[in-house]
Amino acid sequence: MTGNGNFVSDPIIAALLSEVSAKLAEIVESGTSFRIDLRRLPLPVGGTAALRDFLGNGQVEASFRGVGSCIFSETAVAGVWWGQQYNTGGDLVGEFIEIAYVPELLKCETDEIEQAMKDLGLKVREAQQIRGRGSESSSSTNRSPPSSVSNKT
């Protein structure tokens, strides 16, 4: 973790970090993820920036686009993600800490994966049919074998 830890003496910040630590222990035991909405907390002036600096930067950043967008940044603390939510105009409308192996919004739902399996299967079959039609027309012409194929007579 980086940053100046002086702000940790603030009781709200200290309680928040204690909560994050407790939720990390819970996720190891239960696998349940948690989200803390930073905009609903009475953080001191500069507290959000100081907290983000204190938690540091990890190696992963991911975005989700829907109505507006959401950016998740892994912190230097494994399992602790910094989330920022934007409206369609690009204004920051939410900021939160998510304690999770992977942020919930980034996970595929079972029904999405089931539909993706069907869609991919259909796409593969269509591609094979197109390829098969192309092979039939090219097989009627007399072509020499590729140079890597040897003819033994």
Mark where each language-model region is.
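Helix-rich interaction surfaces within compact, conserved domain-sized segments
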Residues: 73-141, 151-152
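Short, structured protein-protein interaction patches enriched in aromatics and acidic/basic residues
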Residues: 37-41, 60-89
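Short, intrinsically disordered, mixed-charge
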Residues: 53-60
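Compositionally biased, intrinsically disordered/low-complexity regions enriched for serine, proline
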Residues: 8, 142-143
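Eukaryotic low-complexity, non-globular regulatory regions
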Residues: 1-3, 144-153
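N-terminal domain-onset segments
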Residues: 1-50
